[in-house]
């Protein structure tokens, strides 16, 4: 695809200098080489190539072109191709900006500013081409029925100059995009280096551990088992000693708690007996007094009842 496109561009550049009635010398060979050098097949470059191919057709100034120039079809086609080119260019720029994330902010801002300037120049020159064609269409319409040979020659000259400017703009844009891409590659390499620096100590530690395990694997199995048994025995003895010490501490604490509880129970019993004796000393006089009063009241009631039941003397005797 790239070879076919390069061949198409060479053919286009070779025919861009043709006039309608008089032959014109072809473009210099260095300019052809310049275009084929930067043409790398990126989507935005392919879109720009389609724009140039359409411009080459316009530069022939054939009868069909002249008829379509009197309408708005040519400018509409150029507008579509311009929009397509700028859209692909923005997409490619966004892709490179994502790859530039590891690069320093200052560097990324500078590269982005330079690329935007080159992109703006390319867009302005493409707009200039369309403006020239619109101007030519207006002049042709104003000169209907008159000779337009001089006007066509002037338009052809303007279009050749604009094509050279577009070629320079595209070359500059391609170079800046290459710088952009190189910056993205450099940032990615720095990110990989940083990861390598962080992982280096971990890899070294793993290597040391592997060497230690390898040296242990070289010992006889019986010696390693004996060493592990001794370490396990020492560990078990240490745990047993700590457990016994802890049990002794718990026993002492339980004995202390029991003694405190017995002491508190005895104190509570003594306090209850004292309180009971105090209550008894308070209420016994009251009870005895109430008993005496009750006995006196009972005697009075009995005396009153006996007096009311005595026989009354009769007056009939």
Swiss-Prot record:
Protein name, as recorded: Apolipoprotein E
Signal peptide: 1-18
InterPro entries given in the database record: ApoA_E (IPR000074), Apolipoprotein_A1/A4/E (IPR050163)
Subcellular location: Secreted; Secreted, Extracellular space; Secreted, Extracellular space, Extracellular matrix; Extracellular vesicle
Location of the region described as LDL and other lipoprotein receptors binding in the Swiss-Prot/TrEMBL record: 158-168
Family the UniProt entry places it in: Belongs to the apolipoprotein A1/A4/E family.
GO molecular function, one term: metal chelating activity
Parts forming coiled coils: none
Post-translational modification Methionine sulfoxide, affected residues: 143
Region (Lipid-binding and lipoprotein association): 210-290
Keywords from the named record: Chylomicron, Endosome, Extracellular matrix, Glycoprotein, HDL, Heparin-binding, Lipid transport, Lipid-binding, Oxidation, Phosphoprotein, Repeat, Secreted, Signal, Transport, VLDL
Region (8 X 22 AA approximate tandem repeats): 80-255
Phosphoserine PTM sites in chain numbering: 147
UniProt region (Specificity for association with VLDL), positions on chain: 278-290
Cross-referenced PANTHER family: APOLIPOPROTEIN, APOLIPOPROTEIN E
Task performed by this protein: APOE is an apolipoprotein, a protein associating with lipid particles, that mainly functions in lipoprotein-mediated lipid transport between organs via the plasma and interstitial fluids. APOE is a core component of plasma lipoproteins and is involved in their production, conversion and clearance. Apolipoproteins are amphipathic molecules that interact both with lipids of the lipoprotein particle core and the aqueous environment of the plasma.
PTM comment: APOE exists as multiple glycosylated and sialylated glycoforms within cells and in plasma. The extent of glycosylation and sialylation are tissue and context specific. Glycated in plasma VLDL.
């Amino acid at each position: 695809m790239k070879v076919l496109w390069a061949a198409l561009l060479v053919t286009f550049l070779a025919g861009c200098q043709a006039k309608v009635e008089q032959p014109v010398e072809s473009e210099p060979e260095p300019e052809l080489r310049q275009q084929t050098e930067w043409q790398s097949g990126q989507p935005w470059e392919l879109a720009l190539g389609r724009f140039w191919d359409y411009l080459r057709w316009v530069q022939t100034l054939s009868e069909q072109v002249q008829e379509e120039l009197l309408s708005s079809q040519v400018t509409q086609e150029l507008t579509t191709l311009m929009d397509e080119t700028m859209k692909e260019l923005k997409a490619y720029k966004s892709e490179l900006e994502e790859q530039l994330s590891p690069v320093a902010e200052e560097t990324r801002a500078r590269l982005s500013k330079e690329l935007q300037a080159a992109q703006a120049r390319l867009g302005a020159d493409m707009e200039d081409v369309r403006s020239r064609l619109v101007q030519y269409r207006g002049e042709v319409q104003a000169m209907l029925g008159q000779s337009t040979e001089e006007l066509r020659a002037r338009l052809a000259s303007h279009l050749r100059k604009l094509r050279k400017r577009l070629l320079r703009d595209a070359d500059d844009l391609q170079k800046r995009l290459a710088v952009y891409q190189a910056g993205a590659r450099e940032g990615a390499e720095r990110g990989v280096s940083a990861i390598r620096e962080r992982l280096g100590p971990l890899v070294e530690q793993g290597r040391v551990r592997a060497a230690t395990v390898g040296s242990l694997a070289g010992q006889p199995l019986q010696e390693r088992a004996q060493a592990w048994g001794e370490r396990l025995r020492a560990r078990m003895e240490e745990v047993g000693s700590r457990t016994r010490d802890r049990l002794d501490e718990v026993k002492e604490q339980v004995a202390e708690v029991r003694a405190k509880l017995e002491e508190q129970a005895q104190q509570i019993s003594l306090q209850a007996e004292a309180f009971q004796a105090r209550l008894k000393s308070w209420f016994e006089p009251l009870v005895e007094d109430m008993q005496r009063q009750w006995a006196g009241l009972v005697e009075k009631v009995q005396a009153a009842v006996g007096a009311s039941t005595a026989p009354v003397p009769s007056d009939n005797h």
